[in-house]
């Protein structure tokens, strides 16, 4: 059976990993060493934290990957290897517009702060952007929503999301590992984040070893 799967670029925030710790290079590295033990160096290589700014980005990436990115990646990889049917992978990257009064933990937040959050793609896929109160949508959001509705509808009907007028969505295959990036401009590109998922995968595999 064909598979269409993916996740969002900013699923969750750095605090999921660092809790109430200040997001610094030192706190991220200390947390990684505690969390991943003898696999910590490999994880830190995949999620670098040479500066505090880099540590903040890596903490958010690690939080998102351990929440949903790695497990979905693993599913896609196994389906590609054993499923015998086409696989299509996406990354929803659009930093979603927010209402003027949007907040995170009581602090005013912008679209850049919230990013491509968990479940943020749902209104795009179902063409229901206007059900979110207070948001002023850009023409590019409506275009992206229309294209996503068409991709998902095509896939539901035929097992292939591609169709007339849409940017080409290549199959996810071992030789290319193409990912469709859903943003103001849609484009396909090879997966560049694989080392992150492989680092987590190695840690998970070791936990299963007696």
Task: Report each predicted region and the residues it spans.
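K/E-rich alpha-helical interaction surfaces of small helical-bundle regulatory domains
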Residues: 146-162, 166-167
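Tryptophan-rich aromatic "cage" segments
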Residues: 185-210
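A generic structural micro-environment signature
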Residues: 98, 128-132, 175, 186-188, ...
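Substrate-gating cap/lid region and adjacent catalytic-acid/histidine neighborhood
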Residues: 1-140, 151, 158
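Mature extracytoplasmic/periplasmic domains
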Residues: 162-189
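Small/flexible residues
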Residues: 91, 173, 179-180, 196-198, ...
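A short, structured beta-strand-centered segment in the mid-to-C-terminal lobe
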Residues: 133-147, 192-195, 199
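A structural signal for short secondary-structure junctions
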Residues: 116-117, 146, 172-174
